[in-house]
Amino acid sequence: MRIRSILALPASIAAALVLCVSASAQSGPSSFLARYQARVSATQAAQPHWITPLVLVTPRLEQELRTDFVRQRNPTSQNIWIYDNGKGLELIPFRRVELLFNTPPFIAHDQKHVADGFGDVTFLAKYRFYGSNEQHRNAIVTAFLGGSLPTGKSGNGSCCASLTPTLAVGKGWRRFDLSSTAGGTLPVSNAARLGHQILWNSVAQYHAGRFFWPEFEINSTFFKGSANDGKAQTFATPGLVIGRIPLTHDAEGKPGRLGLTFGAGEQIVLTRFHTYNHALVFTARLPF
């Protein structure tokens, strides 16, 4: 019953989102929602139009409702399901700025003696320093500031809050594009116990046809301090993202802002040290 309630939450939010977007489309051009959406469209028109990858946080500014599901297999061959995976609502409230309001993931364990529960609340802010669409330089540079609050229960979260500053860049050539992010996790307290993590993710994408985006990611974490001091883990992540499929059209048949994007892939461990062996990643999004 608990899992069913968790899965129903994104569906309820999505239904409310569809109603809001429909109201915006039916309202006049001078309404608040219409002006807001026009500003968002202008902001996104000044950047590349690649699809958001499976794992890497895109340097592009996006406005969407997103939910992910991850099944990890740990070194003891036990499965861990992570429902929603800390995704949620992404908004572009101002020019060059995106804010992400994420719901805490629900973590379910195969092991009977390990308690299931919600993880930590996370948040993220983006500022786009530079953006150029496909008709010009087809490139982007963005800074992130992420963070987490220790709201997790039953050992499914951290003991302390943390901040994660990140720099993200991307460059495209016709149907091919590369993006990379580099950042570090900085505990607000208890740094000696938690240590620090350097996160480096890169992705190569190819736009095959109208909706298909095959990709290959490299996701790396380097540990400094704590019990894993000096260790590193790296995953290769092949995947496929399909989108954006338009769900609305205007009177002239032009696609509206509301769309559907979904995809799947698998993280495959490349290093001897790893906190989990591999993971299946599923994503669903409603850009609006």
What kind of feature is each model-predicted range?
Residues 1-35:
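Cleavable N-terminal export/targeting peptides
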Residues 25-288:
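Transmembrane beta-barrel domains of Gram-negative outer membranes and organellar outer membranes
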